[in-house]
A protein has these predicted regions:
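Non-heme di-metal
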Residues: 21-211
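Bacterial N-terminal signal peptides
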Residues: 8-18
């Protein structure tokens, strides 16, 4: 009887281990690591682009870069938090090399990066997470994806403004949700975040006088 009990116990443990192993969203974990590195690089890059814009006298564009840099940093933090839930710890970002050029060139670089993330990277990552039923990963990817769409629009306006020789088309004030990284200009500001419902009073503000 004891031998039979031990046999079923061993079988049960083995089945549990197989289930746990099969429930690990391996593709989503790799996607999260890629997105973490990508967002970390963007946060650093846009911060440097903001510094360059201020040097060149484009304070409004600099403020936009600062706000988007913060948004990307929040995305990176969210991605790594999900990785930790999946058992991945002690993760450090791998910052890709980039070059700081003129503000006009930097905006185009940012526009291209946001286009790739919006059109290619995040749609694939979201699909992978949904296929693996990795809900936390899907949520983090979706928050970032929705924010990238807005960033792309903002950088498009910035490009037009520079082409016209004026920053008048850009907002002076920007706001970032500290939970999901959603980004607002003054005209679009809501009482709570469209993505995660965080209250407006908790948003992080950026103005032309940001230090």
């Amino acid at each position: 009887m004891n031998s039979l009990f031990r046999f079923f116990l061993i079988i049960s443990i083995a089945l549990l281990m197989v289930h746990c192993a099969s429930s690990i969203p391996k593709k989503s974990i790799e996607d999260l690591k890629t997105a973490f590195n990508s967002e970390s690089t963007s946060a650093d890059k846009y911060s440097k682009f903001a510094e360059k814009a201020r040097v060149e006298g484009f304070d409004t564009i600099a403020t936009l870069f600062e706000a988007v840099s913060k948004s990307e940093a929040i995305h990176a933090t969210n991605h790594v938090k999900v990785l930790e839930k999946y058992g991945e710890h002690a993760i450090t970002p791998q910052i890709a090399s980039f070059e700081v050029k003129t503000t006009a060139e930097n905006i185009q670089t940012a526009f291209n990066a946001e286009t790739y993330e919006m059109q290619t990277q995040y749609p694939v990552f979201i699909r992978d997470a949904e296929n693996e039923k990795a809900a936390e990963a899907a949520k983090s990817f979706t928050w970032a994806w929705d924010a990238e769409k807005k960033h792309l629009s903002y950088f498009s306006v910035a490009t037009t403004s520079l082409t016209n020789g004026s920053e008048k088309g850009l907002s002076f004030n920007w706001y970032v949700c500290p939970v999901c990284g959603n980004t607002y200009n003054a005209e679009d500001l809501k009482t709570s975040c469209d993505f995660c419902l965080t209250k407006q009073e908790n948003f992080i503000g950026f103005t032309e006088k940001s230090e």
